[in-house]
Amino acid sequence: MSDHNLKDDDYWRSKLTDEEFRICREKGTEMPFSGKYVDTTEAGTYLCRCCNTPLFKSLAKFDAGCGWPSFFEPLEKGVITEEMDTSLGMVRTEIMCEACGCHLGHVFTDGPQPTGLRYCVNSASIQFEEEKNQS
């Protein structure tokens, strides 16, 4: 486990914008269709905004029509932690970066094959690293 989990709020406030802090560290949610990566289609990898851990490949991204970037699987097993979320009068499964505890969003069971899962992620919780062409 990374030492990122040991960082306090002052550390994260110095590294993140106010909106990123609200979403990543206080488990907020951005408005649907407002995030930077909702319509991104380029090839590459989505990293944790807080600690740069690779979380999702663009090949797993799909348009769920929900207003948030959606993926049918994480990059590899163990990079995402799941926890029951009973906030807002609902029962959902929260997803977080295993390395630093960054709130990413939620996972639902209405996704496409091959997994049937929809990892619904806030754009403010991730950053995109475009795949470099190898010549």
Swiss-Prot record:
Its cofactor is Zn(2+). The gene is msrB. It comes from Teredinibacter turnerae (strain ATCC 39867 / T7901). Keywords: Metal-binding, Oxidoreductase, Zinc. It comes from the Bacteria. It is an enzyme of class 1 (oxidoreductase). Belongs to the MsrB Met sulfoxide reductase family. This is Peptide methionine sulfoxide reductase MsrB. The active site is at C120 (nucleophile). One of its GO terms (molecular function) is peptide-methionine (R)-S-oxide reductase activity. InterPro entries: Met_Sox_Rdtase_MsrB, Met_Sox_Rdtase_MsrB_dom, Mss4-like_sf. It catalyses: L-methionyl-[protein] + [thioredoxin]-disulfide + H2O = L-methionyl-(R)-S-oxide-[protein] + [thioredoxin]-dithiol.
